Amino acid sequence: MISVAVNGYGTIGKRVADAILKQPDMRLIGVAKTSPNYEAFIAHRKGIKIYVPQQSIKKFEESGIPVAGTIEDLVKASDIVVDTTPNGVGAQYKPIYQQFQRNAIFQGGEKAEVADISFSALCNYDEALGKKYIRVVSCNTTALLRTICTINKVTKVEKVRATIVRRAADQKEVKKGPINSLVPDPATVPSHHAKDVNSVIKNLDIVTMAVIAPTTLMHMHFINITLKDKVEKKDVLSVLENTPRIVLISSKYDAEATAELVEVARDLKRERNDIPEVMVFDDSVYVKDNEVMLMYAVHQESIVVPENVDAIRASTRLMSAEDSIRITNESLGILKGYLI
């Protein structure tokens, strides 16, 4: 049983903490919070131990939230830390993990140099075995890599061109925008996503562009893939249908908008309305000779959660990629095939 600490209890951290509680081979020691907001109150109500910076203990106790100890205490009590702090903050915590000789999983908001390896479970799990510091790539990069590595099973992927329509903010981020604008992210080409993909697939010819749209629900990707050999559409659809963490969306559902997909998640009683699978619109799959085009939606709040669970097992050499991915999927109810 591996003892896991989660440093940060926001959008990703609370989902990772809940996922760890569902794993048969992991034990959640507690979570770290810096302010006694509603997420801290909910964690306390769930019975999760809360650790805070030394200077914040009084503030938490005055708010009525018991403190189990400092963040240093949390790190010491664990075998491995999943750092889900805001972008760039994880690198500031790394010296503490090093001080106590603890393995750590970082998120895609950190620079690749913070870790020994950037990670995508379907692409390079075996390369991450035993690595002390692993960086789970961002939500958009996770979706790109899942898709690319899946289609690579049909025949070698030689070139990728992708356009990313990014959501402006998560639903709880009330101070972010835009409200009524499309914003290049950035106007220069390629966007950072191409470099991030190359941190996992080193020599792939990939160019990405991105724009921020005034929505909070999901990202959308429009991707053009050039393959080494000619392929048939049925082969592409088959590999997408039979790969875990990818689901197909049929036009029969009459649910193709991201808002409608959120409603599907609600009706399926998905926790927090999460869809951690890449959602490929099957009608969008176009194949001509060695060229493949497709469109898919990405739920940014949950897609990296199973990757974090697998990264824990890879770092600690708990089990093989096949076994870890299977157990993670089963414990979290992650599908393959068609969403409905």
UniProtKB/Swiss-Prot annotation:
Matches recorded under InterPro entries: DapB_N, GlycerAld/Erythrose_P_DH, GlycerAld_3-P_DH_AS, GlycerAld_3-P_DH_cat, GlycerAld_3-P_DH_NAD(P)-bd, Glyceraldehyde-3-P_DH_2_arc, NAD(P)-bd_dom_sf
GO CC aspect terms: cytoplasm
Main location group: cytoplasm
Residues involved in D-glyceraldehyde 3-phosphate binding: 138-140, 193-194
EC code: 1.2.1.59
GO molecular function: 4-hydroxy-tetrahydrodipicolinate reductase; glyceraldehyde-3-phosphate dehydrogenase (NAD+) (phosphorylating) activity; glyceraldehyde-3-phosphate dehydrogenase (NADP+) (phosphorylating) activity; NAD binding; NADP binding
Keyword list, A-Z: Cytoplasm, Glycolysis, NAD, NADP, Oxidoreductase
Catalytic residues identified in the record: 139 (nucleophile)
UniProt binding sites for NAD(+): 11-12, 109, 167, 300
PROSITE patterns in alphabetical order: GAPDH
BP GO terms, sorted: glycolytic process; lysine biosynthetic process via diaminopimelate
Subunit description: Homotetramer.
Name the UniProt record assigns to this protein: Glyceraldehyde-3-phosphate dehydrogenase
Source organism: Saccharolobus islandicus (strain M.14.25 / Kamchatka #1) (Sulfolobus islandicus)
